[in-house]
């Protein structure tokens, strides 16, 4: 029996060892963002059309903030009003600040320009702007010159009479005490300031400037990308406090920021003001606490927490804000969006109304995230999407106004809420101009045109030289153009036309008029449909001798155009989706001295909804990693919601193997963020963790259009989105395809340029659920256009590591075997 057991264990050990080399994955729990509990009743989040309810949410309409600016309000302070601490002006009168936050200045720094700040102050009615200075994520630590953007933003805010929040954008990692926030010298030998020195430096440069508000820690959180995170509890708040209190004290003691407002974040992405408001707040007279929320993730509530509720049971963000207010703490919503917490989906505008009504009612100041043309719901401007839209320029131009079409739905909505006016969205239906000939007479017939039965004069109608010739117009001479004038003219109509034509969106009706000698011709029109049979023409439209041009055959031709004002029934039909099928038209035709004229190419032109051809992807299939695509499916790969490219994902052959393929091109006009125009592919995979893997590898092939891969580079970035790390964990390495060195690439038998890509992932935590893997093909000043192929995507490790893993697992299994044998004795 014992020998059989040994053999069984040996077999199991062998199987486990083999498995360990190829799939060292473990299950991990998803992080809890903490926004649901049963202690308060949440207001349900629903993705549905927006309906403003100003009777229910009257605080949305307050007429704006025109007089509540630094030039009038002066230095800010905190006062107590009816038991609630709130922001006030220099005279102690409560003041609310409303405006926008920039996105990361390292990515979208071009928003810092005179025209943009003027637009925000004047056209948007903002009295505050927030400057988001990231530290990691290729920002201030790696490019200390970004501080110049902060200086420029401060100056522009002052010039445009706005308060300005200097945001030390703690994000990745989530512990503000992490080494990256301590300052030092970067890899290029450049010195960058730590948090305390940074704020002291700004205060010294702008001593006691009433415009300035200092935000010390954007979002403390459990995010462990690039360093440690903090816990969502009292210990997490204590970590924030231990970071913030010395900076607050240093600013006050410096004499350069004696009374400036300071804002401090809280654990769980600044959703735990309740922790900050408890037993150990910041010791300061002018400190506020940060509130962050996204209306597609964080539910509102009409309730507050009952007394005695423990901190671990407080998870509704709005209730946390109410808790802080009840405890006498002032809060400032320095970041919020109409999307879900990751910046996508929605927009959730009904929920935004709930939140903004709460903020406005309680005089809580706010800045919206964010001033970017990035392809995410929370961005304020129209993004670049290949074949769909061009990115809005972050400099609005000398008129200092962005048109509504240049704003995203979020931007349009937030602008109205800053202004305190009704939100009236524009029609964003994609439209296209069109021009279509209805009657061309090229078939040798009159195409249904006959003398109308009510015509006061008789004429002959026939097809001559593929045009509709009308003979007998000698006495049809009413050419004054007024409505009462055309009734005496000849009437023709398409009574025998047996077709219909959809003219939805038509704005004009035009036709060629051909005569033997130039003259004046007058035509009035009454288009007809089954739903709109009659509406008198307002007038005839005239063309005169000067409008005609001689043709090669000696005749003369002019174009006569009838608008909806001339023919109201044209508009009636063209604007009725249920009655837009044209089935007849009556024309009243008069001439000054011509007996015969010909009509040709009767055409409608206008503007109608554009219905793009649907993108046909190959079958998605089940998520698989490794991904070899040999089953003919995409094995779960899809476009990320922020991808600027959404062309067809198909399975094609590359180098003798199935591969995932798509076509795309980078635009000639480049945004400052090279990710803004990038294809973004993502794969969601259950229980995806790094484990012992060291890199992600895949085969990448490119097949460029001729002369469209000659300059710049394609930079391949690798991202995971673990919930427990703030949905963002980026591999520090990238893989560059230098298009100027394309000739040195391996070329396959089928003529493709082949790259064996490896991206190191050892800086990604190895024991948390990663949720999804994303590949971003960024545009580094590239002219690339063509087709690309992706194959054999896998997580892998070096041979040395495989040996180490094998040895470790052998040891573990041997220990287990000893334990089993001991039990058998």
Swiss-Prot record:
Sequence ranges of Basic and acidic residues compositional bias: 607-621
Q: Which EC numbers characterise this protein's activity in its record?
A: 3.2.1.4
Q: In the UniProt record, does the keyword Hydrolase occur?
A: yes
Q: Which Pfam families match?
A: CBM_17_28, Cellulase
Q: Which Gene3D superfamilies match?
A: Galactose-binding domain-like, Glycosidases
Q: Which UniProt keywords apply?
A: Carbohydrate metabolism, Cellulose degradation, Glycosidase, Hydrolase, Polysaccharide degradation, Signal
User: Where do the segments described as Disordered lie?
Assistant: 607-635
Catalytic activity entry: Endohydrolysis of (1->4)-beta-D-glucosidic linkages in cellulose, lichenin and cereal beta-D-glucans
According to the record, the segments passing through the membrane are none
Q: Which PROSITE patterns match?
A: GLYCOSYL_HYDROL_F5 (PS00659)
Q: Output the InterPro entries linked to this UniProt entry.
A: CBM17/28, Galactose-bd-like_sf, Glyco_hydro_5, Glyco_hydro_5_CS, Glycoside_hydrolase_SF
Source organism superkingdom: Bacteria
Q: Catalytic site residues?
A: 219, 335
Q: Name one GO biological process term.
A: cellulose catabolic process
Any one GO MF term held by the record is: cellulase activity
Q: Where does the UniProt annotation place the signal sequence?
A: 1-28
Regarding protein family, the annotation reads: Belongs to the glycosyl hydrolase 5 (cellulase A) family.
Q: What is the protein name for this chain?
A: Endoglucanase C
Q: Which gene encodes it?
A: celC
């Amino acid at each position: 029996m014992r020998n059989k057991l040994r053999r069984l264990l040996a077999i199991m050990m062998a199987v486990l060892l083999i498995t360990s080399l190829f799939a060292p994955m473990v299950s991990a729990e998803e992080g809890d963002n903490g926004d649901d509990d049963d202690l308060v009743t949440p207001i349900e989040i629903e993705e549905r059309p927006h309906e403003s309810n100003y009777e229910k949410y009257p605080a949305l309409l307050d007429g704006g903030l025109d007089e509540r600016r630094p030039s009038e309000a002066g230095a800010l302070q905190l006062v107590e009003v009816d038991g609630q601490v709130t922001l006030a002006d220099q005279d102690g009168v409560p003041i609310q600040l409303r405006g926008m936050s920039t996105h990361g200045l390292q990515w979208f720094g071009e928003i810092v320009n005179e025209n943009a700040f003027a637009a925000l102050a004047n056209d948007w009615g903002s009295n505050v702007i927030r400057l988001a200075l990231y530290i990691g994520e290729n920002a201030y630590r790696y490019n200390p010159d970004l501080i110049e953007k902060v200086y420029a933003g401060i100056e522009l805010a002052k010039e445009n009479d706005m308060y300005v929040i200097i945001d030390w954008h703690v994000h990745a990692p989530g512990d503000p005490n992490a080494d990256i926030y301590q300052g030092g010298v970067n890899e290029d030998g450049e010195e960058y300031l730590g948090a305390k020195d940074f704020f002291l430096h700004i205060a010294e440069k702008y001593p006691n400037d009433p415009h300035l508000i200092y935000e010390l820690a954007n979002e403390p959180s459990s995010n462990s990308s690039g360093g440690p995170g903090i816990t969502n509890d009292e210990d997490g708040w204590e970590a924030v406090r231990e970071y913030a209190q010395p900076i607050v004290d240093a600013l006050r003691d410096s004499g350069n920021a004696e009374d400036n407002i300071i804002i401090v974040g809280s654990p769980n992405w600044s959703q735990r003001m309740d922790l900050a408001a408890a037993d150990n707040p910041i010791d300061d007279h002018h400190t506020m606490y940060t509130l962050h929320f996204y209306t597609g993730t964080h539910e509102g509530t009409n309730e507050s927490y009952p007394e005695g509720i423990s901190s671990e049971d407080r998870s509704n963000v709005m209730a946390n804000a109410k808790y802080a207010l009840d405890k006498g703490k002032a809060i400032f919503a320095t970041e919020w969006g109409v999307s879900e917490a990751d910046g996508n989906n929605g927009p959730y505008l009904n929920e935004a109304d709930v939140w903004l009504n709460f903020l406005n009612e309680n005089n809580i100041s706010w800045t919206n995230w964010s001033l970017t043309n990035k392809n995410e719901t929370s961005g304020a401007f129209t993004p670049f999407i290949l074949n769909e839209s061009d990115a809005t320029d972050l400099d609005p131009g000398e008129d200092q106004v962005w048109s509504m079409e240049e704003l995203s739905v979020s931007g349009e909505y937030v602008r109205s809420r800053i202004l305190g006016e009704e939100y009236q969205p524009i029609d964003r239906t994609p439209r296209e101009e069109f021009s279509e000939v209805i009657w061309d007479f090229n078939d040798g017939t009159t195409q249904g045109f006959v003398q109308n039965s009510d015509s006061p004069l008789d004429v002959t109608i026939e097809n001559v030289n593929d045009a509709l010739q009308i003979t007998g117009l000698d006495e049809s001479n009413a050419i004054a153009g007024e409505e009462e004038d055309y009734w005496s003219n000849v009437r023709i109509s398409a009574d025998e036309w047996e077709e219909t034509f959809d003219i939805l969106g038509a704005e004009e009706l035009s036709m060629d008029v051909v005569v033997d000698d130039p003259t004046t011709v007058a035509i009035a029109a009454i288009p007809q449909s089954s739903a709109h049979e009659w509406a008198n023409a307002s007038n005839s439209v005239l063309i005169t001798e000067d409008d005609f041009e001689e043709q090669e055959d000696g005749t003369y031709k002019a174009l006569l155009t009838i608008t909806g004002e001339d023919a109201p029934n044209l508009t009636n039909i063209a604007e009725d989706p249920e009655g837009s099928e044209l089935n007849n038209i009556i024309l009243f035709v008069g001439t000054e001295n011509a007996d015969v004229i010909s009509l040709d190419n009767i055409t409608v032109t206008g503007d109608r909804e554009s219905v793009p051809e649907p993108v046909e992807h190959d079958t998605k299939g089940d998520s698989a990693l490794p991904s070899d695509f040999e089953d003919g499916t995409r094995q779960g790969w899809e476009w990320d919601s922020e991808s600027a490219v959404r062309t067809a994902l198909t399975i094609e052959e590359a180098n003798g193997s199935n591969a995932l393929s798509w076509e795309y091109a980078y635009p000639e006009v480049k945004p400052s963020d090279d990710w803004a125009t990038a294809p973004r592919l993502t794969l969601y995979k259950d229980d995806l963790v790094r484990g012992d893997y060291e890199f992600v590898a895949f085969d990448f092939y490119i097949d460029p259009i001729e002369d469209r891969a000659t300059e710049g580079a394609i930079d391949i970035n690798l991202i995971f989105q673990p919930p427990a790390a703030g949905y963002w964990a980026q591999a520090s390495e990238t893989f560059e395809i230098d298009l100027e060195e394309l000739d040195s690439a391996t070329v396959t038998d089928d003529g493709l340029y082949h790259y064996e890509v490896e991206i190191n992932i050892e800086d990604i935590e190895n024991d948390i659920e990663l949720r999804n893997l994303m590949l971003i093909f960024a545009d580094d000043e590239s002219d690339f256009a063509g087709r690309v192929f992706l194959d054999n995507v896998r997580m892998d490790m070096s041979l040395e590591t495989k040996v180490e893993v094998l040895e470790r697992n052998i040891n573990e299994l041997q220990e287990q075997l000893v334990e089993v044998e001991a039990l058998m004795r």
